[in-house]
A protein has these predicted regions:
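Beta1/beta-strand and adjacent pyrophosphate-binding region of the FAD-binding site
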Residues: 6-10
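Glycine-rich Rossmann-fold phosphate-binding loop(s) that bind the pyrophosphate
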Residues: 13-14
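N-terminal Rossmann-fold NAD(P) dinucleotide-binding loop
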Residues: 17-18
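Conserved S-adenosyl-L-methionine
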Residues: 26-32, 137-139
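Conserved N-terminal Rossmann-fold NAD(P) cofactor-binding segment
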Residues: 32, 36-75
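Conserved NAD(P)H cofactor-binding loop of Rossmann-fold oxidoreductase domains
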Residues: 81-83
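Rossmann-like NAD(P)(H) cofactor-binding subdomain of soluble oxidoreductases
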Residues: 91-156
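C-terminal substrate-binding/catalytic lobe of Rossmann-fold NAD(P)-dependent dehydrogenases
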Residues: 138-142, 151-216
Length: 216
């Protein structure tokens, strides 16, 4: 009986790639992680940092720096490459720079033999994910964007802080594009399974005072 090695390749060893790697090792979601970065020294440093961190975790994960040839037998590739917005820039303002980086990344993916699933975090996340799908000419179900998952988490945290309850009791989602055009489906927000609108009617002095525009 063969045992599958849960191998993940992370493209981009910067701030976001660092957090992705730590999340994977701390939750024992990967047996092996390979960092790929245009700055080889940064990828090596990141791999060493995470390897050191595994000393304090119950499960060991092999973390190395490599290149696209290491993606051939990986199941998941996480793309976290690209510039961060600076000054008054929005995520969309970085689109041109990110596309130039992703041209090289997608060309390397084609040559690598990688045949798994791609999760894209590079911003503007949804637009870049669409670009990757077309650049690779892959079925869309093989390429995912993190999209508004972070925004949804922030929304639940903000509601929880305002009314003083555990955010795990809240179901709320930011919808649309991870950027300036996203929106909140307030009619679908529930707390402990009860619609927020009902809470606001029953408890006007607490839930009723929530500033939905500010929270969104």
């Amino acid at each position: 009986m063969s045992i599958s090695n849960r191998k993940v390749v992370i493209v981009g060893a910067g701030h976001v790639g660092s957090h992705v790697g730590y999340a994977l090792i701390s939750q024992s979601l990967a047996d092996e992680i390979v960092y790929i970065d245009s700055d080889r020294a940064k990828a090596v440093a990141q791999a060493l940092d995470l390897t050191d961190a595994t000393n304090y975790l119950p499960v060991r994960t092999k973390v190395t720096a490599g290149d696209y040839s290491d993606a051939a037998d990986a199941q998941i590739m996480i793309i976290a490459a690209g510039p961060l917005p600076s000054g008054n820039q929005t995520r969309m303002d970085t689109l041109g720079q990110t596309i130039e980086i992703l041209k090289e990344v997608t060309a390397s993916i084609k040559k690598s033999g990688f045949d798994g699933i791609i999760v894209n975090i590079s911003n503007p996340a949804d637009v870049i994910t669409h670009y990757i799908q077309h650049a690779l000419n892959w079925a869309p179900e093989r390429i995912f964007s993190t999209s508004t998952t972070l925004d949804s988490a922030r929304l639940r945290r903000a509601i929880a802080q305002e009314i003083g309850i555990d955010q795990k009791s809240i179901t709320a989602y930011a919808l649309g594009e991870h950027g300036e055009s996203q929106m909140v489906a307030w009619s679908a927000v529930t707390i402990a399974g009860k619609p927020l609108s009902q809470w606001r009617e029953e408890y006007p002095d607490t839930f009723g005072k929530l500033d939905l525009d500010a929270l969104a």
